[in-house]
Swiss-Prot record:
It comes from Rattus norvegicus (Rat). This is Protein shisa-5. Keywords: Apoptosis, Endoplasmic reticulum, Membrane, Nucleus, Transmembrane, Transmembrane helix. One of its GO terms (biological process) is intrinsic apoptotic signaling pathway in response to DNA damage by p53 class mediator. InterPro entries: Shisa.
Length: 130
């Protein structure tokens, strides 16, 4: 037997041995699995916190008084002593003017003058090839 055959046989035996060990450690019926993977007692390192919800004191419901308070409008406050007055008058802005009516966005007369409408009835018939 030559050197190459000896190396091939040795390598094959090594691969088979490693495969057997892997299969034996993963199979539950193997003696190596039973010896190395004994069931261990489960130890809990977690703590349990119990939260107790107590009733939050609710305020006594107040019966609504009808009619409710009415809105009295805006009353500007007088400026405080030593503070400058507001640089703008305290009044409402003028109402917006209505938009002026401008020309429509599409004019048929201008659009018709630039290009005639397409009508397939006016197309030239196909020309015969001589």
């Amino acid at each position: 037997m030559g050197f190459g055959a000896t190396v091939a046989i040795g390598l094959t035996v090594f691969v088979v041995f490693i495969a057997t060990i892997i299969v034996c450690f993963t199979c539950s019926c193997c003696c190596l699995y039973k010896m190395c993977c004994r069931p261990r007692p489960v130890v809990s390192n977690t703590t349990t916190t119990t939260v107790v919800h107590t009733a939050y004191p609710q305020p006594q419901p107040v019966a609504p008084s009808y009619p409710g308070p009415t809105y009295q409008g805006y009353h500007p406050m007088p400026p405080q002593p030593g503070m400058p007055a507001a640089p703008y008058p305290t009044q409402y802005p003028p109402p917006y003017l209505a938009q002026s009516t401008g020309p429509p966005a599409y004019h048929e007369t201008l659009a018709g003058a630039s290009q005639p409408p397409y009508n397939p009835a006016y197309m030239d018939p196909p020309k015969a090839v001589p």
